[in-house]
Amino acid sequence: MSPWHQAGATEFAKNHIVSDGVSQYLVYRLIAQRDLDREGTIGWSSLTYGGTAEYANTMASYGDWTMQLHRWLDFWTAWHVGILGQVLIAAFGMLSFLRGRGIGWSWAACGGLLYAANSQFVTWLYHRWAMGSFCWVPWVLWAIDQYRAGNRRAWPLVPAFIAMAFLGGTLQHCALVAIAVAVMWLDEALTHRADAAGRGMKSGIAGQAPLFTRYAIWGVLGAGLSAFMLIPCADAFLTSNRLGLHTGMTANAADSIYRYGWLQPILHVAAIPLQWFPSILGRCGSLDVLKLFKSELFYIAFFGSLPVIVALVRGWRRSSPRICRLMILAGLMLPLTPLVRFLYQRLYLLFIIGGIFAFAHFLQHAGRETRTRWAKRLAALLALITVGWTAVSLVLLTHQAQLESLKQRIVSMGAGSSFGYLSDWLDLRATRFIGDLFVWSPQQLWPLLLLALIVSGLWLTTSSAHGLSRLGHWLIIGGVIAEVILFGARWVVWSDPKKEPLFAETPESRILKSAVGSDGRVTTVMHPTGHMAMTPFVPNTLAAYDIATIHGYDSIVPDGMLLPNESPDDAAKLGRFGVTHLVTYGGNPDVPSDWRPIWKSRMMDLYANPLACPRYAGFADETSLQRFFTSTGEATVPLDEESGLQNKRRIHIPAGLSWIRIAENQADGWQWRISGQAHWNDVIRAQDKSMVLNVGHSNTSRIVELRYQPCVRTVGTIISAASLLIVIVGGLWGGRNVEF
């Protein structure tokens, strides 16, 4: 991305698919690090959109426990410790759940490791949603199982783990967690009905009511414990949706209830059998074959070749535990429904949970005859694939002209993409894709060898010799773990932060810091086609440098002065919103003449806005303020803000001023008072949605204090505290072995 790629560079991004991890999710962590260090809290941010309730960002997971690590640790230490903690939580959670379901130590440990390294955790690693939320789900299932087994002390653990899962993800992941809990309820309800039928009793609605009530209480308390984040995020989502700005709710709405049309669910079904061998679906360094199936590499559901095959084949059978069948059914079928429009194929997380349990249960309980049959069939399948693929590869060697034509076609198709400007990079990706078509390419050879190792291990487990059987046992475990490690290694990018800083300083960033400073604000005019490759500092990335912008890119957007991409180059309009500078790609010929050029490079052109108004402006009376909003010539008195903080500010007001206008989005929760006074007043929302303060006339200078204390966060915190009290009381009551 510009301006970090330099002219003549021969190295390109290993994984461009996670570019929003750089432009958004790593930036969120940097914001958390900065605000927790400076102010001890994450609240308001003036760095994007002209001001937004940053703490309520639905995609940032600011309520997750790993965010608190940034209070005490440096950025990368907090990042790595948080990931390690989530991996361990996921692994031990699945281990505990499988052990509670009667799975032996070795297969349970294998299941835990496969779950901790499953493809959904890996592909969304930079976003942290999937792992942050679903690392807790096995613990939710384990706690429910413990309560069902008679351990009443497990009662408070269920809502506690649900809350941790809610806080670790997005609103989408909250829904996925709720579905997982609902599947557990359905499993228990069916068991309850079967038990009642066995005793000759009826199990109608009345009989199921206590069970449903228990799960409902758990869910409500889990939501209550996380209400301090859940309520603000839900409010932000509803606000953005009301404005028609929430991408997932509005994209392609006129075309179909499916984002990619009615063919989408059919193609998704066709792609399901390919999940067991994901290397054929492309890689982040070449091409994404799943796009042909109206999907993408983000949505691979891989946790080892044999485990996926077992889940797809055996997971439906009655010999598998019902909870496996229900999780697999939910994970595979729900993405084919209109729910995929709102929850995407992240629903595959349910399939992964059920599939890992099905795999562990199969190898724990399958007899020698069953394993022999499976080993023979898999060996035959592997041999057929290897021989056939080798033959095709040899044929391809004799058709180099056709392969070159295919490569050129791929490059030309990608020329119109966001990164199409980087033609050498497109050529490299196409070359890699062509190379990966051959069976002996490392992309395909290593997974095939690991699959052969696993099949050999499965064959050895059928031996009557105990030593060979145990060897096969460990070959399977080692093979499937090696598979998920290989998948992860091909996705994750490793670098030395000291040699390659996350947001390196460039001549462009230095001039922006110097010219814009802490009081200015930037607007960005993007490249019309190759915006990701050509536009310097794509939205949100300037926040990493503490440079404020009027635009941003998130799933939710504030109801503020300017909507996204509205009038990005209108100097007069933007000047009223405190926009002092315009950034655009080098050589942009279409910048309006109102902007004054001050710096140019191959990567970036920088312009100043002569029409910019000060962010903090004073007015002698209301008439002057109204003239400011209705005309362009009204003079203002620039004011100084002393603190440099986001959530608590101090503005020096000279004598004779009675009104203050702040070129920042007004939002509920902003209050002000004259320093030394006790009473706080609400900030007024101006007609252009900026902030206005009526401080009254005074013949002496004063200090005005502002604070940001949103009501929705206060209400959510109160609900969380009340829920915590109920959970504690319920836990103490449940500890007396009273069933409720």
List each language-model region with its residue ranges.
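Extracytoplasmic
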Residues: 251, 413-420, 427, 433-437, ...
